[in-house]
């Protein structure tokens, strides 16, 4: 066959398309992925038929599927489909705009060549939808651009025989010599139009334009070099001599009117919807997160309206305009993420994010201080010739997720994790050994060395926990000094009060965290005895509800204990119709149980309780459970930590209403910001605090590693657009590598340069104990990763958990399993459907 890579990838596209055809033939309405696959694959088949042109196929692609053949969200998710195929005259790009543009498609064309039966259109119901994924609800009012700047009007005539287009931030005095206007008045001025737009002068055109003064230090660079330097009226005669000497069109315009932007005579204003179409939503606008019912309202926008950083042809970030000239690399950003809506536990706001040396060095307004107002452009956020741009207009940026309950059963879990937006993994294991399949322990120093070395080039921060189940300290110091950044107590190794006490004593000496999976059997005691064994010392309780393991039926009581830092694992997130039914077999496999042994079955069944799973939902919403993690391949799904967090938040909004920001219902705002901040903290800052590395990762804050995830709002929580790891793009949606542009199908999450060679280690951290760092494991193991010590975890309490510090008194009825918090029964119904699911995923 001699297949090249692009052919192999197109085969995968064809398989997805054929799968979609089979589902369509059964009368199923297609989701986003299926619709894209079917359209792209069919276009390639029509290319092979050889009797249609590119233009023909661009039109035909819009005829295949209608709104009734796809799920209601799909027309809003699917804007274009692009694919490249081999025509008789070579490889060509076909772009289908608005591919779902009619009520019914042509199903004969959609199934052409498949030999599948064409279903009746009666199989497809018409379901309208008022809400759509990623929708923006705009604030009323208008935004005035370049407010308080000096402004004037000029007449401009194009004397050329070609069109001339001038961008918003081009120094107008430097414009094309064939444009005739009053260049003296234009000194130090630019167009008063939205940033990144332009005015086009056709041959012979005469237009009146409004100019505004440049901002900042008022320094002109670039263009034709006519007025190079600081704007200084005393030098204007010299500048005008250059204008005339170099043949630049100039004509006095005494009819010019002058004023100040804001006085109403020279203003340029846009409404919020128009503004968002160019730069993304701004203060007061609300964004639907994916297809959930959660709305994030932008609380603050650091932009200076009219001076936004926009990259592209004729846009703002060009030499002498938004990009500064004359600044060394040391004064400029390595990378700037522009116009991002940041969703973080610290707030929901819009800003540029500046990255240097892999760290977030500033958040605010980036650009060129020579032409942009100094009260806007942060001195740490200068864009220069050494700066790369990641355009995030209309996008959401979050901190990279942290999964702090990982069974390292297979290395491929790292690929799944980063593709979902997880950038830090904490747990233990050695591969698919039975101990690892059940417990997160990396037991021996040789295992620890193996795991740190084997994950060294992965573009993910790593931390490994040793086994803590022993009643004597012997052996624990060795694994800690070998690199363990924490210890794990697991019932499969014996989580007895004696082992708990000893493990915590050693952890206190080394300032590391202890994670515990308690005793489901109640063999050495019940939950109150385990709590007593803690002796008020800090401990992190895994799957604190109990389905993942722990004292039956009331381990959930620990969520009301001050020194306990509770977390959940994601199979029970949220409580759905099928949650209970899937768990028994999951548990039997993970814990090496035998369904032929009655006691093993009873052990498994005792852990699965609908009542406590339902209560877990509500405790999360109250902020009484602080973390959500995966329990990867050991009763958990590593690629769904983020998705299931937002599914839980959405379920709680639907069942409990808007979350008030205080005890008074009247304090609820007309948005979901508080709930959103509470839930994002569960997989970002709180696991970072619990594990002792919040100085390095866990939030979008200055000084932290630039581990950032970029999302399209319509795909938020389901599928990221790009994952930035330590300032480098490590994973991103990328199309056909042979294509003329990056977007033709098949588009998939692929590793980028930040994940290859030594880049993965250079942009990531290996977290170890202080003792291990001081012992020099970085050198001993020849690690490329930056090695950092965890710390300040002993003495943490629930009150240190951001936005998740509630301490209700929890009781569980041992017979009915009814859970109460401060006397209130915690009860909710399982949901039959969740968002971030069927609209997005193929399987």
UniProtKB/Swiss-Prot annotation:
Family label: In the C-terminal section; belongs to the metallo-dependent hydrolases superfamily. Urease alpha subunit family.
Active-site residues annotated for this sequence: 591 (proton donor)
Entry binding sites for Ni(2+) 1: 405, 407, 488, 631
SUPFAM superfamilies in UniProt: Composite domain of metallo-dependent hydrolases (SSF51338), Metallo-dependent hydrolases (SSF51556), Urease, beta-subunit (SSF51278), Urease, gamma-subunit (SSF54111)
Chain positions recorded as Ni(2+) 2 binding sites: 488, 517, 543
Name of this protein: Urease
InterPro entries the UniProt entry points to: Amidohydro-rel, Metal-dep_hydrolase_composite, Metal_Hydrolase, Urease, Urease_alpha_N_dom, Urease_alpha_subunit, Urease_AS, Urease_asu
Catalytic activity: urea + 2 H2O + H(+) = hydrogencarbonate + 2 NH4(+)
Cofactor note: Binds 2 nickel ions per subunit.
Keyword field: Hydrolase, Metal-binding, Nickel
Role noted for this protein: Urea hydrolase involved in nitrogen recycling from ureide, purine, and arginine catabolism.
GO terms, molecular function: nickel cation binding; urease activity
EC number: 3.5.1.5
Residues annotated as signal peptide: none
GO annotation (BP), single: urea catabolic process
Processing and modification events after translation: Carboxylation allows a single lysine to coordinate two nickel ions.
Cofactor: Ni(2+)
PANTHER family reported in the protein's UniProt record: UREASE
A GO term from the CC aspect: urease complex
Positions bound to substrate: 490
Superkingdom in the source lineage: Eukaryota
Organism: Oryza sativa subsp. japonica
N6-carboxylysine PTM sites in chain numbering: 488
Disulfide bonds listed in the record: none
Cited NCBIfam families: PRK13192.1, PRK13203.1, PRK13207.1, urease_alph, urease_beta, urease_gam
Complex and partners: Homohexamer. Other oligomeric forms may exist depending on pH and presence of salts.
């Amino acid at each position: 066959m001699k297949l090249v890579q692009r052919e192999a990838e197109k085969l995968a596209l064809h398989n997805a398309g054929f799968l979609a055809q089979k589902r369509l033939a059964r009368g199923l309405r297609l989701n986003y992925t299926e619709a894209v696959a079917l359209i792209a694959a069919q276009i390639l088949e029509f290319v092979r038929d050889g009797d249609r042109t590119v233009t023909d196929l661009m039109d035909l692609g819009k005829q295949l599927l209608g709104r009734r053949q796809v799920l209601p969200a799909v027309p809003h998710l699917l804007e274009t489909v692009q694919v490249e195929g081999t025509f008789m005259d070579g490889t060509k790009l076909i772009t289908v705009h608005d591919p779902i543009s009619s009520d019914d498609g042509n199903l004969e064309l959609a199934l052409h060549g498949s030999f599948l039966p064409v279903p009746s259109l009666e199989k497809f119901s018409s379901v309208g939808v008022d809400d759509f994924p990623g929708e923006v609800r705009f604030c009323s009012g208008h935004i005035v651009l370049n407010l308080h700047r000096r402004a004037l009007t000029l007449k401009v005539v194009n004397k050329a025989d070609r069109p001339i287009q001038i961008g918003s931030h081009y120094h107008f005095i430097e414009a094309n010599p064939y444009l005739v206007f009053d260049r003296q008045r234009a000194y130090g001025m630019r167009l008063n139009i939205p940033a990144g737009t332009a005015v086009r002068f056709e041959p012979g055109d005469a237009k009146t334009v409004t100019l505004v003064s440049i901002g900042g230090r008022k320094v002109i660079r670039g263009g034709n070099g006519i007025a190079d330097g600081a704007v200084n009226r005393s030098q204007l005669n010299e500048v005008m001599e250059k204008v005339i000497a170099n043949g630049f069109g100039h004509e006095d315009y005494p009819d010019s009117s002058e004023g100040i932007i804001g006085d109403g005579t020279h203003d340029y204003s846009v409404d919020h919807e128009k503004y968002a179409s160019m730069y993304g939503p701004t203060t007061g606008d609300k964004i639907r997160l994916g297809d959930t019912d959660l709305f994030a309202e932008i609380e603050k926008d650091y932009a200076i309206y009219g001076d936004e950083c926009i990259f592209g042809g004729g846009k703002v970030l060009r030499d002498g305009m938004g990009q500064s000239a004359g600044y060394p690399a040391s004064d400029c950003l390595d990378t700037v993420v522009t116009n991002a809506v940041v969703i973080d536990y610290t707030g929901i706001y819009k800003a540029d994010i500046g990255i240097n040396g892999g760290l977030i060095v500033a958040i605010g307004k980036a650009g060129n201080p020579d032409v942009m107002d100094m009260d806007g452009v942060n001195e740490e956020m200068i864009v220069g010739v050494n700066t790369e741009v990641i355009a995030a207009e209309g996008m959401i940026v979050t901190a990279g997720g942290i999964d702090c309950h990982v069974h390292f059963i297979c290395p491929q879990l790292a690929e799944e994790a980063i593709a979902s937006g997880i950038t830090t993994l904490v747990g233990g294991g050695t591969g698919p050994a039975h101990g690892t399949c059940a417990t997160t322990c990396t037991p021996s120093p040789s295992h620890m060395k193996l795991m740190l070395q084997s994950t060294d080039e992965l573009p993910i921060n790593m931390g490994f926990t040793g086994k803590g189940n022993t009643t004597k300290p012997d052996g624990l110091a060795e694994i800690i000094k070998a690199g363990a950044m924490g210890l794990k107590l697991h019932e499969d190794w014996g989580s007895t009060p004696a082992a708990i006490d000893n493990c915590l004593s050693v952890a206190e000496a080394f300032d590391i965290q202890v994670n515990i999976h308690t005793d489901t059997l109640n063999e050495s005691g019940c939950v109150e005895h385990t709590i007593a064994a803690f002796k008020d010392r800090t401990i992190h309780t895994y799957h604190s509800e109990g389905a993942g393991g722990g004292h039956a039926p009331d381990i959930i009581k620990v969520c009301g204990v001050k020194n306990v830092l509770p977390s959940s694992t994601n199979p029970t997130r949220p409580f759905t119709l099928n949650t209970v039914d899937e768990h028994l077999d999951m548990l039997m496999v993970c814990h090496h149980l035998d369904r032929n042994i009655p006691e093993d079955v009873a052990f498994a069944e005792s852990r699965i309780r609908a009542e406590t799973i339902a209560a877990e939902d509500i405790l999360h919403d109250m902020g009484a459970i602080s973390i959500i993690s995966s329990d990867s391949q050991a009763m958990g799904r590593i690629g769904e930590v983020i998705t299931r967090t937002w599914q839980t938040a959405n379920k709680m909004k639907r069942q409990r209403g808007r979350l008030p920001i205080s005890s008074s219902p009247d304090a609820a705002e007309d948005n979901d910001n508080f709930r959103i901040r509470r839930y994002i903290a569960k997989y970002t800052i709180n696991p970072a605090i619990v594990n002792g590395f919040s100085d390095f990762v866990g939030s979008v804050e200055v000084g932290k590693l630039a581990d950032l995830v970029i999302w399209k709002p319509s795909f938020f929580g389901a599928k990221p657009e790009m994952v930035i790891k330590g300032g480098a793009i490590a994973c991103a949606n990328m199309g056909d590598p042979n294509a003329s542009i990056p977007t033709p199908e098949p588009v998939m999450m692929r590793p980028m340069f930040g994940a290859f060679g030594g880049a993965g280690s250079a942009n990531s951290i290996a977290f170890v104990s202080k003792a291990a760092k001081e012992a020099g494991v970085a050198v001993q193991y020849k690690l490329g990763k930056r090695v950092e010590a965890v710390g300040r975890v002993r003495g943490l309490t629930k009150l240190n958990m951001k936005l998740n510090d509630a301490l209700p008194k929890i009781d569980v009825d041992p017979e009915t399993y009814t859970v109460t918090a401060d006397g209130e029964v915690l009860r909710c119904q399982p949901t039959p459907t969740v968002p971030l699911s069927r609209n997005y995923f193929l399987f």
